[in-house]
């Protein structure tokens, strides 16, 4: 594939990466740095089944193109059924973690952390009163794909090693 992926780390260093695979049902992808630095540390994933409503969270992303943005809030609800439509107009339901940390266009794919610095989910979508995604913004109802589902899908993508992957895993 002609897809070129560049990853910029917090220190500003850029690295080429390769797409390992994607999952259309969760809109998740796995990439691999081609020549990662030897001191690069992976994030730790929390057990999303142990999350509690009221727990402090921080969402990281690039909303509206503003790099390295962090917003804070709490877990508002667990196992919230969220329906999104994929590129083929198929409806996909994920039992998401609802958070009130501001999520805006550009945050999707970024991590949501707990107070211990562990990933509890991946920012995915927001509830909005806007009629178009161009005017959508945070009203305090954001959703993250739970970390346990993220881990299962990523492990399956890595095991499958196919660029196009459709998960049959259901969120629990």
Predicted regions and their residues:
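Serine-dependent protease modules
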Residues: 1-167, 171
